Regions:
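N-terminal phosphate-binding or glycine-rich loops at protein starts, especially the Walker A/P-loop
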Residues: 1-45
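Short beta-strand segments
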Residues: 9, 38-39, 61, 102-104, ...
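Short glycine-rich anion-binding loops that position phosphate/pyrophosphate groups of nucleotides
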Residues: 11-12, 65-66, 105-107, 115, ...
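Short glycine/serine/threonine-rich phosphate/pyrophosphate-binding segments
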Residues: 16-21, 82-95, 99-113, 120, ...
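Glycine-rich phosphate/diphosphate-binding loop of Rossmann-like nucleotide-binding domains
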Residues: 18, 35-37, 43, 148-206
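Short helix-capping segments at alpha-helix termini
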Residues: 28-33, 49-58, 170, 200-205
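Phosphate/nucleotide-donor binding subsite
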Residues: 53-97
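Short, acidic/small-residue loops that bind anionic groups at enzyme active sites
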Residues: 110-145, 202-206
């Protein structure tokens, strides 16, 4: 079985390398077969790497550039092409890594990911997904902040992405599609939500 390789933006998040490297060390203990590629400022990370001597299944790639939480996504995309975030996403693009993790600037993460990785045919926008516990197991909720204004088509696409994610990642054979609304009655919500409800009913019946 092929080893999973995950790229990590060491500089992302409010606490920077300290929290990120601690998190990678915890993950490597739980998943010893996963390899990590860390992208960030080596000098600023050395002290935290030394504090986690059990972290051995990783490579570190140095860069002086990082994206701050208040950087505009467009500027991060155009000007910070050697940032730890950009290099990690490039690693997925080149298929050297299977996934990428960053606790950094969400807007920049979405913008760079869409520019570098693109979206698959039939999907117009990326979405942020979260996995929430339920009485019966788990549910995938999206979008959780990547998009402000959505069309009916966008919402349907998000549902389809959630369906595929549930099947592949969570192992749910027949996910149930739902629509988060202001009420359970089909007459509730604006015109976009109502149309989405009708479209999801058609998809669910197929």
């Amino acid at each position: 079985m092929k080893n999973i390789v995950i790229a990590i933006d060491v500089m992302g998040g409010d606490l920077g390398p300290k929290a990120t490297i601690e998190g990678v060390a915890m993950a490597s203990k739980i998943h010893p077969n996963v390899k990590f590629k860390l992208f960030g400022d080596k000098k600023k990370s050395n002290i935290d790497l030394d504090k986690n001597p059990n972290l051995s299944n990783f490579e570190f790639f140095h860069t002086n550039e990082s994206i701050k939480s208040d950087d505009e996504p467009v500027n991060a995309l155009r000007k910070l092409k050697n940032s730890s975030m950009r290099l990690g996403i490039n690693c997925v693009k080149s298929m050297e890594c299977d996934g990428f993790v960053s606790a950094g600037n969400t807007g920049a993460l979405m913008a760079i990911s869409k520019f570098v990785l693109k979206t698959i045919k039939g999907i117009d926008r990326p979405a942020i997904a979260g996995i929430l516990p339920t009485m019966k197991g788990q549910t995938v909720v999206l979008d959780l902040g990547a998009n402000v204004d959505c069309t009916n088509e966008n919402l349907v696409q998000f549902a389809l992405m959630g369906d595929v994610f549930s099947k592949i990642v969570l192992g749910i054979k027949k996910p149930v599609l739902g629509l988060l609304n202001v009420g359970s009655e089909h007459i509730k919500g604006n015109s976009i939500v109502k149309q989405t409800f009708e479209d999801l009913k058609k998809i669910s019946s197929q």
